[in-house]
């Protein structure tokens, strides 16, 4: 169900990150090297989740793996125990909570009209649902973390803190961001561009759906303009 996916991606997954932040406070900050295996696993997990996104044909599964990949960066940033790392982790958790929940809403909006979640069968929706295409574009750009979004702020802080801790991590982070951009653009092009494959009449978008998307993206944009509210 869509409500369960939204709550799981936006709240419950982030509660795990919050729990790690609280637990890390009881460990000495000078023993970061002890957590090196966990940092490597977190970054490697982010890469694997991103690569898994590239081979997904199910729209909902793609968004779910996207949430997992972002949490890999969050865990790595928390474990190194630096102020920038914690600030970046908090920023990315909040921003991606809004973004992933909005993506699940859009996936459900598409499913209600096409009755399928297969990417290749949902193409061409920009011809019939142009306003929904606008929401898809904005949400995917947020997922890619374009400036000046909160996602960009969080990823920039995480990249800076991890690079300062170990310069080699910039290779993994750069690869992760490249794959994220690839599957986000693939998701947008697969669902919106191309000829429409549906022969039946498509129901137009409703005001409640636009309101739901507005309630996701407007708070995210407001926080992006004033990030000191959360970090």
From Swiss-Prot:
Compartment(s): Mitochondrion membrane
Gene Ontology terms, MF aspect: NADH dehydrogenase (ubiquinone) activity; ubiquinone binding
EC number(s) on file: 7.1.1.2
Membrane topology: Multi-pass membrane protein
Reaction(s) the record says it catalyses: a ubiquinone + NADH + 5 H(+)(in) = a ubiquinol + NAD(+) + 4 H(+)(out)
A Gene Ontology biological process term: ATP synthesis coupled electron transport
Record keywords, A-Z: Electron transport, Membrane, Mitochondrion, NAD, Respiratory chain, Translocase, Transmembrane, Transmembrane helix, Transport, Ubiquinone
Residues passing through the membrane, by range: 1-21, 34-54, 63-85, 89-111, 124-146, 169-189
Catalytic EC class: translocase
UniProt-listed InterPro entries: NADH_UbQ_OxRdtase, ND/Mrp_TM
Recorded GO CC terms: mitochondrial membrane
Domain of life of the native organism: Eukaryota
PANTHER family: NADH-UBIQUINONE OXIDOREDUCTASE CHAIN 4
Family membership noted in the UniProt record: Belongs to the complex I subunit 4 family.
Its job: Core subunit of the mitochondrial membrane respiratory chain NADH dehydrogenase (Complex I) that is believed to belong to the minimal assembly required for catalysis. Complex I functions in the transfer of electrons from NADH to the respiratory chain. The immediate electron acceptor for the enzyme is believed to be ubiquinone.
Protein's recorded name: NADH-ubiquinone oxidoreductase chain 4
Species this chain originates from: Crotalus lepidus (Banded rock rattlesnake)
Lineage, highest ranks first: Eukaryota, Metazoa, Chordata, Craniata, Vertebrata
Gene from which this protein is expressed: MT-ND4
